């Protein structure tokens, strides 16, 4: 059994659902959890758990599929094989065998538009000319020929009519794990329908091919449950083409921003000492290695997980060659076949599954990976690293930037590196603590599934929810992200090393490497900020003032007296998904404060939610252009309502007003604990579900063993113990900062309250004295009470805080800015559509006094 806490503390997890032995082994092993989730254990797991399912291991060549016409062929085939193992080629060969007549119908479900187009091109070039894509349909619903052989993106599955959907002979799920992962994407507008349609296809389709480099036990288990063990065949490919198996990956400890600054420094007299030119100093750095290869004439491809770093590294490369191609979400993707015309190609996750470059043109690859709460996740990074199929020198150099990971002590790494485990063995204390954290994470995911009505109604969505949370929540910790990427590369037959170490790695080596990377990222952060390409300057206030869509946006969300320049600044912030999400949550909070009954009636809140959180809003992109962006629907509104109910209560106690800058009164750590205590566990669960922040509970963090392991795996110097109030302050900060974009700042005020000390009223002073149990029975006048308060000034000397709204938050319509009865006509009109019974009742009648 896994470690469950110290003898004195009992079980820090509390009463929870017991985990069975097999499930415990799968989900609570911090060393092998990533291996399980990405299919590395299929060859051992299938015979043990589903003995009637046949399994075929292919080790010595490109993957092959079972004979489609063989009488013993099973109806479901799951293929797990690395990138570069020939899966798509084998699929095309299999389809040629399986399509016996012109009437044989095939549905191919993909995960991305680019993948759909690439697959259609490959099919056509291979003689499968009858396949069409959903792009060619002139009607919204596709219900007849030529769509009997269709390649469709999973988000558009609901556009396939019942005449076709119920009669497909073959279902192909290429990149099946990515396809199922799209169920959790903001672009999924019809989740319930798509989930139900996919489930129907998986149940009734005569032949199914599901293939992916990371197909895992969850997928096989799900298909065995739907179709029966005897009808499932699993192919495990353990071969990768030399373009991958001969590739050598090296994790670098330093970025080398001093070399970057020197290369980009404008001509003129030197402003300081030149960077260290020693081979040792340059060799351990990203930019030192890149400079050496570009100077030596190599052709290099570079992956960057952020657009801003892609822009910076492009500027660096242009110091060596003009033939630099930069590809990200803000540039045209172009034709991949033209990459051979460039010495350097730099790309982000915009180049992913479905797009690949096969010619032997590039000598090596560099990768800059910055784990951040809003992605990209490590699977997307891994897929993007495989877009260039061959490298002359087989070199892949990776720098992990830890500055985007969370530094708060309540975020605890829960994964252990698998190479360290096989070479030097992690100390028992490390494995006990991290196994416990994995178990706690599984329990939190299970609680999410139990609480969500949507999850109960959507079987596929619910089945793979754990993997979605795992990939998002682990982005908070540098070591977790590094371990996941390390495992994915290892499973793809790529040899991975850390700079300064051979294939063996001890726990001490790994923790020291993490610490070095962590501190280097913090040092490099300021340099990168100075060099970052700034948004182009554009004068947009006049255009914003004259645009109808902006006018409607202002009327709906903002105060009437907001200046055009403030509107422009807000629309720039709304260009990111994170900015839009926080804006909507803060707008909903203000609406709940203006209409308090929204916290007592789900129908009222739902109407307010539909009013503010749906439709389109104007944004300004990085090129300075006005752009309308659709707000993604929230898949389940219930936890959003619960969050707003709890936070509006907190906001009212803190005298919250966005227009006034945030909280109207200051508060101390004890006040924070008091605010959170009634619903502490629910706050942690809601932050997990809505913010993808896996906060370790305070009881666990009070364990000395947990604290030591967390310090070692976080790459940080030893930190003190986390007290109950410390934990509450950290959780409070995450709730407001991560979900609403609100910062918690230290206040300079000695005493609670919104005003200056000398302006405190007699009643306020009495309240302060009573709160600190200071006897004031001998004081009658304001002067006497004030003198007594000042005499006990030291008792109020603890840290005090205020919540500060971001600059754009001051533009929002609030309860104070809506004092005018006509100030919120649009919301009033929306609420007027609610039936009378939706409003709170008192003795059978609407309670008008509370409206």
From Swiss-Prot:
Effect of mutating residue 204 to T: In strain: Nonneuroinvasive mutant HF10 and 17 syn+
The keyword Nucleus belongs to this UniProt entry's keyword annotation: no
InterPro entries per record: Helicase_ATP-bd (IPR014001), P-loop_NTPase (IPR027417), Replication_origin-bd (IPR003450)
Keyword Nucleotide-binding found: yes
Cell location: Host nucleus
Pfam families: Herpes_ori_bp (PF02399)
The entry's keywords: ATP-binding, DNA replication, DNA-binding, Host nucleus, Nucleotide-binding
Gene Ontology terms: cellular component: host cell nucleus
Residue span(s) of domain Helicase ATP-binding: 68-233
Superkingdom, taxonomy of origin: Viruses
GO molecular function, one term: DNA replication origin binding
GO biological process, one term: bidirectional double-stranded viral DNA replication
Binding site for ATP: 81-88
Chain positions covered by the region annotation Disordered: 1-21
Function of the protein: Functions as a docking protein to recruit essential components of the viral replication machinery to viral DNA origins. In the presence of the major DNA-binding protein, opens dsDNA leading to a conformational change in the origin that facilitates DNA unwinding and subsequent replication.
Subunit structure: Homodimer. Interacts with the major DNA-binding protein ICP8. Interacts with the helicase/primase component UL8 and the polymerase accessory protein UL42.
Protein family according to the UniProt entry: Belongs to the herpesviridae OriBP family.
Protein name stated in the entry: Replication origin-binding protein
Source species: Human herpesvirus 1 (strain 17)
């Amino acid at each position: 059994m896994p470690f469950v806490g110290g003898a004195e503390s009992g079980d820090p997890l509390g009463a929870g659902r017991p985990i069975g032995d097999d499930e415990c082994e799968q989900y609570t092993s911090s060393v092998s959890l990533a291996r399980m989730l990405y299919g590395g254990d299929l060859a051992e797991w299938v015979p043990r758990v589903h003995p009637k399912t046949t399994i075929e291991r292919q080790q010595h060549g490109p993957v092959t599929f079972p004979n489609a016409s063989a009488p013993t062929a099973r109806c479901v085939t799951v293929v797990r094989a690395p990138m570069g193992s020939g899966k798509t080629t084998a699929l095309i060969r299999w389809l040629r065998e399986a399509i016996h007549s012109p009437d044989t119908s095939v549905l191919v479900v993909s995960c991305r538009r680019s993948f759909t187009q690439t697959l259609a091109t490959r099919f056509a070039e291979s003689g499968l000319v009858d396949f069409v894509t959903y792009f060619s349909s002139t009607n919204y619903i596709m219900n007849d020929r030529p769509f009997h052989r269709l390649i469709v993106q999973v988000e558009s599955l609901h556009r396939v009519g019942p005449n076709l959907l119920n009669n497909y002979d073959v279902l192909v799920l290429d990149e099946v794990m990515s396809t199922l992962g799209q169920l959790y994407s903001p672009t999924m507008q019809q989740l319930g329908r798509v989930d139900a349609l996919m489930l129907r296809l998986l149940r009734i389709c005569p032949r199914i091919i599901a293939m992916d480099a990371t197909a895992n036990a969850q997928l096989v288990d799900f298909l065995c449950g739907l179709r029966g063990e005897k009808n499932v065949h699993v192919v495990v490919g353990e071969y990768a083409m030399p373009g991958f198996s001969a590739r050598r990956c090296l994790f670098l400890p330093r970025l080398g921003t001093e070399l970057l600054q020197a290369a980009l420094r404008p001509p003129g007299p030197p402003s300081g000492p030149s960077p260290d030119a020693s081979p040792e100093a340059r060799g351990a750095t990203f930019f030192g290695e890149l400079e050496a290869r570009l100077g030596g004439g190599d052709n290099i491809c570079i992956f960057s997980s952020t657009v801003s770093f892609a822009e910076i590294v492009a500027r660096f490369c242009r110091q060596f060659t003009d033939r630099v191609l930069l590809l990200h979400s803000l540039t045209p993707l172009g034709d991949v076949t033209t990459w051979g015309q460039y010495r350097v190609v730099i790309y982000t996750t915009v180049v992913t599954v479905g797009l690949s470059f096969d010619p032997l043109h590039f000598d090596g690859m560099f990768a800059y990976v910055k784990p951040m709460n809003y992605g990209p996740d490590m699977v997307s990074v891994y897929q993007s690293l495989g877009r260039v199929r061959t490298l002359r020198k087989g070199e892949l150099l990776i720098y992990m930037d830890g500055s985007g990971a969370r530094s708060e002590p309540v975020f605890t790494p829960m994964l252990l590196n698998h190479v360290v485990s096989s070479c030097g063995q992690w100390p028992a204390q490390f494995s006990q603590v991290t196994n416990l954290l994995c178990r706690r994470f599984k329990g939190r995911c299970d609680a999410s599934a139990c609480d969500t009505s949507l999850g109960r109604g959507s079987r596929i969505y619910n089945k793979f929810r754990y993997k979605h949370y795992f990939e998002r929540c682990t982005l908070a910790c540098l070591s977790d992200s590094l371990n996941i990427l390390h495992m994915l590369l290892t499973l793809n037959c790529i040899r991975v090393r850390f700079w300064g170490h051979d294939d063996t790695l001890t726990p001490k080596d790994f923790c020291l490497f993490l610490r070095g990377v962590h501190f280097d990222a913090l040092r490099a952060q300021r340099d990168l900020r100075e060099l970052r390409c700034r948004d182009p300057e554009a004068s947009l206030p006049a255009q914003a003032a004259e645009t109808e869509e902006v006018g409607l946006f202002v009327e709906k969300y903002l105060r009437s007296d907001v200046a055009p320049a403030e509107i422009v600044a807000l629309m720039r912030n709304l260009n990111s998904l994170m900015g839009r999400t926080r804006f909507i949550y803060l707008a909903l909070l203000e609406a709940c404060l203006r209409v308090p009954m929204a916290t007592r009636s789900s129908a009222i809140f739902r109407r307010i939610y539909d009013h503010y959180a749906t439709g389109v809003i104007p944004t300004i992109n990085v090129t300075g252009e006005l752009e309308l962006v659709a707000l993604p629907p929230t898949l389940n509104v219930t936890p959003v309502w619960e969050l707003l109910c709890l936070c509006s209560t907190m906001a009212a106690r803190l005298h919250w007003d966005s227009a006034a800058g945030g909280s109207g009164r200051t508060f101390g750590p004890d006040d924070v604990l008091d605010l959170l205590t009634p619903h502490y566990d629910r706050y942690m669960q809601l932050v997990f579900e809505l913010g993808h922040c896996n906060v370790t509970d305070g009881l666990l963090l009070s364990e000395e063993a947990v604290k030591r392991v967390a310090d070692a795996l976080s790459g940080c110097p030893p930190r003190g113990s986390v007290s109950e109030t410390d934990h509450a302050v950290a959780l409070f900060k995450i709730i407001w900062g991560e979900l609403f974009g609100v910062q918690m700042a230290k206040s300079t005020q000695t005493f609670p309250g919104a005003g200056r000390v000398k302006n405190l009223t007699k009643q306020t002073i009495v309240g302060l004295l009573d709160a600190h149990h200071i006897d004031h029975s001998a004081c009658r006048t304001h002067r006497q009470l004030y003198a007594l308060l000042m005499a006990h000034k030291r008792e109020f000397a603890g840290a005090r805080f205020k919540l500060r709204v971001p600059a754009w938050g001051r533009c929002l319509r609030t309860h104070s800015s809506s004092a005018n009865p006509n100030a919120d006509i649009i919301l009033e009109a929306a609420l007027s559509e609610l039936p009378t019974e939706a409003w709170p009742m008192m003795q059978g009648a609407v309670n008008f006094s509370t409206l």
